[in-house]
Amino acid sequence: MNSIKQILLISTSIILSSIALIYYVYLLIVPTLPPLDNLADYRPKEPLQVFTKEGDLIAEFGEEHRDFIKIGNVPQKMINAIIATEDRRFFEHYGIDLIGIFRATYKTLLGISFEGASTITMQVARNFYLTSDKTLKRKISEILLSLEIEKHLSKEEILELYMNQIYLGQRSFGFNSAANTYFSKNLSELNTAEMALLAGLPKAPSRFNPFNNYDLAIKRQKDVLASMLRHGFIDESTYILALDQPINLKESKVKKDVDAEFIAEMVRKDLFDEFGEKIYSSGLKVFTTIKNKNQKLANQAVRDGIINYINRHQPREPDGFLDLENIALKHIDGNEEELIKEVTKYLKKFPTFSDFIPGIITKMQPLEIEVILKDGRIINVYKKGLKLIENDKNYEDQTEDYRRIKVGGIYHFIKNRNEWILTQLPEVESALIAMDPNTGEINALVGGFNFEKNKFNHITQAYRQPGSIFKPFIYSAAIEKGVTPATLVNDNFFFMTADELMTKENWEPKNYNDTYDGPTRLRVGLSKSKNMVAIRTLKYIDPKYAQDYVSRFGFDKQKIPPYLSLALGVAEVRPINLISAFAVFANGGYLKEPYYIDKIIDSNDRQIKLKSSITNEDTPRIIDPRNAFIMDSMLKDVIKDGTAKRARILKRTDIAGKTGTTNDLIDAWFVGYNPEHIALTWFGYDTPQSLGDQETGSRAALPIWIDYMKGALDGLPEKIYAEPEGIIPHKINPDDGTLTSNDDESGIYEYFYEEFYPKDNAFFMIN
């Protein structure tokens, strides 16, 4: 009787519990289940990607690294590894594993944490809609959602969602992204052992992270391989081979094809200003105007220019010092590995920027030094890479204590064209921008030595004094007012009293090197960058007129004071404005605003535009084409026989440009172009200080431009600047600028506006 009562009691309890569970499920849980729209139209969180014009990756912005892959492109062996490990009956069940679910539910009711009974479908449900809380409600919701997912999606579609959505550590979502993160490979490039390691990550990505817990990760990988063997996904020979296959870990955050971090940050900021935080997850692809070849040339040229500058000057004290004798005594047994380990541990606190690697000098000989690098490599630097030692004025001292380059000192080392070079982490900065003068399309931009070291963009953010590079705009204003390239200007001492200037001090500017040539043609004054010629020309045309005139080139009028010192570039300009201003001379008179975004593609492959998009179509002409032509011819002479004659090494007749140096050698500039390409280089310190003796624009900035242009113009035919209407070419006497017969062999051709052509050959000089 008691047995019957017990059976009835248990049966009643089960029935009532079932009714309660059904009520709980259908009245309290089912109404709260989310719709499956996200799965039917799957849009994974994808980072913002920035590309070159050719489509090579520059940068990626977003918290989740994801590289979406279609299920048809996933290697079958990768699928097999996942099925064997996560859900071996995946292709047989309808979303749930009943035996596993009953076991998990029973343990949950008893308050015992359950072990994994989740199918792949259930993991998809959880990853898209639910938390990982181990509660009954969440588990029931997961089951119901899994059943719904199986009703609406095929097994292949479910597997594709899983392959791309699952978190696998190191901010990587999806197996294709994880392959790149852990191995720097695509999924299709992995061997069986590497696939098995990835397949073991979903269970506990942090615990089985091979970077942090290598031994645990390998143990888990072996479990995956054993499961694949046990369930017939691989045979015995493949299993044994996989156990011996190498696991070549190689961390890769993002595979960048081109180093252009400054332009990437400019793009990111523009998009963030317009679209906000969603840019980091909406899968936008931005194709810039940056060209692979040009950007790589620019990076190399700036780097070489900085290294050459460092090697021209007295080295600083080492970044640090390690007493190698004491370390050697600790390892008197001759254990070199332990010594290297201790040295590299010390070197870890010194930063690596670009490919400037910290290292310690361990041995010094007259023509060779031995170095241990931060990564443990032992290298030798030979004579070609030891120019810094030649500039160490204390090197010949008898005691090593006074030397700045010495054993135990911490310096930086860089491999340049297969030669190691001893150098130091630069304190100086340099920048380069290059663009098409006819469109404004930026093809290369280097905002500074290294973006990680200093994110300040010297091309777009820095206001610097242009110095003598500003003179062409003064001469352009003068030509528009009737002065000609043949006009004589007195290159002699200039003095103005404080009363004349209405200031507290007299003003007595000087030419560079303090040399003066007397009456000098305007053209020669520009090519030799004569300060007195520029000052007297500005005084003749009036500084206020010049201020109004040059503002049409895009300069901020408030930063261009209408004083005579403007002739020496005492103003403030941004390099990006300066290059677009010079492009006016290159393109026949048009002001083209520099731009760097070619197109933006959204996740639906539709092209979108920023409100701030720049279009240079129908750009108005800001100066007379004759003015641009004459200025171009004068700027060609700067290279032909002036301060930039070093650029003749390029052996081109279609290039023009101007050097620039500010007072006390604080800023060095060069800008140069041909009709199809223009580039500007700047060199200086963030906190203004002298670059050092003779560090003019022609020495510090021009070589960078030459190195860049050598490659940028390689293979491009020379282009002739067409002479516009309204120009009269006529020979002049080079000594006094007066007209002479066109048959006069001693005469040289000069260009004149037809309305300013000196018909009466009147002699005229600006004093």
Where are these regions (language model features)?
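Active-site SXXK
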Residues: I82, M228, A298, P366, ...
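Short, well-structured active-site flanking segments
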Residues: F91-I101, F173-N176, D235-I240, I479-D499, ...
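Conserved catalytic neighborhood of penicillin-recognizing serine enzymes
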Residues: K107-K134, S188, K255-D259, N438, ...
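A penicillin-recognizing enzyme superfamily signal
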Residues: T288, N292-Q295, N299-A301, E336-D355, ...
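Mid-domain, small-residue-enriched loop/turn segments at the edges of structured enzyme/sensor domains
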Residues: T503-P509, D542-S580, Y596
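Non-catalytic, structured segments within soluble enzyme domains
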Residues: I22-Y23, L27, G111-L373, T537, ...
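Short active-site loop at a secondary-structure junction
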Residues: D67-G72, D392-Y402, L425-S430, K453-F473, ...
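N-terminal type II signal-anchor transmembrane helix
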Residues: M1-F51, R89, L109
